[in-house]
Structures are given as C-alpha cells and as structure tokens.
Amino acid sequence: MKREELAAKLLSLVTGIAPDVDPATVIPGINFRDQFDFDSMDTLNFAIELHREFGVEVPEAEYSRLASLDKCVAYLSDKVR
C-alpha cells in the first residue's frame, strides 16, 4: 500500500474516533494530542481500529509510535501490504 493511501485510511480512522476533526487541517508531523486533544482512550480506540482495518496488533508499549500521522505511516508502512 502506498504511503499516501495509508495516510488517507489513517485519517479516516482518526475522524471516526474524533468526529470534530477536519482531515484537511491535520498536520502530519504534529502529535494528535496537541492538535485535537486525543487522550489515552482515543489512542486505545485508534489501536483497536488499526487492528480491525489492517490486522495489525499494536502493543501498548508502542502506542507512542501512533502519536502523529507521520509516525503512524512510518510505523505501519512495513506492516501493511
């Protein structure tokens, strides 16, 4: 899967968890928490959605690798085909 495709799918998952987020305003290198108050429950829900969508299980110890769109794409690009 191309990085752009992956980023678009990730944005869709983020907006499913945080419906007030406008995908056009997400800055890829800025942490979700800083941009739109993503809290620990949002991160857990995001990890669950990643598992549902891509079959990728993210251990809790690696949740920091899901902190921003750029980090998510980097983390998942090798795991998602």
Where are these regions (language model features)?
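Catalytic nucleophile serine of serine hydrolases
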Residues: S40
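Short active-site alpha-helical segment characteristic of glycosyltransferases
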Residues: F46
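Phosphopantetheine carrier-protein modules
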Residues: I17-D37, F54-A61, R65
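Thiotemplate assembly-line natural product biosynthesis machinery
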Residues: M1-P23, L76-V80
